[in-house]
Amino acid sequence: MGKFTVLNHPLIQHKLTLIRDKHAGTKEFREIANEIAELMVYEITRDLPLESIEIETPMGKTIQKQLAGKKLAVVPILRAGLGMVDGVLRLIPAAKVGHIGMYRDEKTLKPHEYFVKMPPDIEQRDLIIVDPMLATGGSANMAIEALKKRGATSMRLVVLVAAPEGVKAVQAANPDVDIYAAALDDHLNENGYIVPGLGDAGDRLFGTK
């Protein structure tokens, strides 16, 4: 089964508290969400493989390290996932970006896919799937399956806030995908929202209702 990890770095926890506050405005929410994403990706990429190469500095030749293995791509689940992309790209500017569009039926809480656009070499990349909220797990599972159908074999899911129900659902359906969260909250309410959560991440990111 894929591992589930809460990233307890003090800066991540502090910044998450700032955007949980209902008084945080759109600008503040958007900026801090990207800051958290950047910190989280810094943490989850600690295990990336390195290889030795020879380079020449102004002082002479030397053997140094560079990233090896698969290249990276970030895949936001639209629309809220867009609010984490810039933070990831600040840390990994060469990463390709794919997009998966999902919307949730407010009555059934079931996800529906409406858009998928991926780099052509998706099977050769380590994918970082980003979405602020992991609630029921339906959207995450549908996104993961869409990526697998297109050849993806290496994926990590990065979320700001997770509910136990969503973690269990993703681990049951996709045990090969590791999940990273800034927080594991208490439960889902009757409307499928995470409690205490941070509200509707998409609306808070883009100033909509």
UniProtKB/Swiss-Prot annotation:
Names of required cofactors: Mg(2+)
EC numbers: 2.4.2.9
Signal peptide: none
GO molecular function: GTP binding; magnesium ion binding; uracil phosphoribosyltransferase activity
Enzyme type, top EC level: transferase
Pfam families: UPRTase
Annotated 5-phospho-alpha-D-ribose 1-diphosphate binding sites: 79, 104, 131-139, 200
GO aspect biological process, one term: uracil salvage
Gene3D superfamilies according to UniProt: 3.40.50.2020
Free-text remark on how the cofactor is bound: Binds 1 Mg(2+) ion per subunit. The magnesium is bound as Mg-PRPP.
Residues that, per the record, bind uracil: 194, 199-201
Regulation: Allosterically activated by GTP.
UniProt cross-references to CDD domains, sorted A to Z: PRTases_typeI (cd06223)
Alphabetical UniProt keywords: Allosteric enzyme, Glycosyltransferase, GTP-binding, Magnesium, Nucleotide-binding, Transferase
UniProt catalytic activity: UMP + diphosphate = 5-phospho-alpha-D-ribose 1-diphosphate + uracil
InterPro entries the UniProt entry points to: PRibTrfase_dom, PRTase-like, Upp_B, UPRTase/APRTase, Ura_phspho_trans
This protein's pathway: Pyrimidine metabolism; UMP biosynthesis via salvage pathway; UMP from uracil: step 1/1
Family in the record: Belongs to the UPRTase family.
NCBIfam families: PRK00129.1, upp
Entries under PANTHER family matching the protein: ADENINE PHOSPHORIBOSYLTRANSFERASE (PTHR32315), URACIL PHOSPHORIBOSYLTRANSFERASE, CHLOROPLASTIC (PTHR32315:SF4)
General function of this protein: Catalyzes the conversion of uracil and 5-phospho-alpha-D-ribose 1-diphosphate (PRPP) to UMP and diphosphate.
Name the UniProt record assigns to this protein: Uracil phosphoribosyltransferase
Native source organism of the sequence: Lacticaseibacillus paracasei (strain ATCC 334 / BCRC 17002 / CCUG 31169 / CIP 107868 / KCTC 3260 / NRRL B-441)
Gene this protein is translated from: upp
